[in-house]
């Protein structure tokens, strides 16, 4: 986690300017990287369902999570991170889609208020 963070920050130093920054995975101690089959048109949906199951299973064990699209984009866009991406050894035609940060929560923030103006019920 630390070395891939250093590689990404080398190419994009502004990332490290965030308050409390430790790594590109929201300071999580563990990360799962999800890759999709670029030849299958429903692969991204399947990966979303996979991630949901990982997140729910982790929560049932008291482990918090955060789904991260930006971390995956930073890795894909960073030439310095290419060796780490290569070490992930995804199968042919597979591409990194997103990451899931995992760890024991150290806070319990209140839920944000729901925007009722964004909800529409239809009969």
Write out the residue ranges for each language-model feature.
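Acidic, surface-exposed loops and disordered segments
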Residues: 1-123
């Amino acid at each position: 986690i630390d070395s891939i963070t250093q590689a990404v920050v080398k190419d994009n130093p502004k990332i490290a300017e965030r308050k409390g920054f430790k790594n590109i995975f929201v300071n999580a101690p563990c990360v799962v990287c999800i890759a999709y089959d670029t030849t299958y048109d429903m692969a991204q949906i399947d990966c979303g369902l996979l991630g949901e199951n990982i997140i729910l299973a982790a929560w049932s064990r008291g482990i918090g999570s955060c789904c991260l699209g930006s971390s995956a984009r930073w890795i894909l866009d960073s030439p310095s991170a290419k060796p780490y991406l290569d070490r992930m050894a995804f199968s042919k035609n597979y591409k990194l889609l997103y990451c899931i940060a995992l760890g024991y929560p150290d806070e319990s923030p209140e839920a944000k208020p729901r925007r009722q103006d964004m909800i529409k019920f239809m009969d």
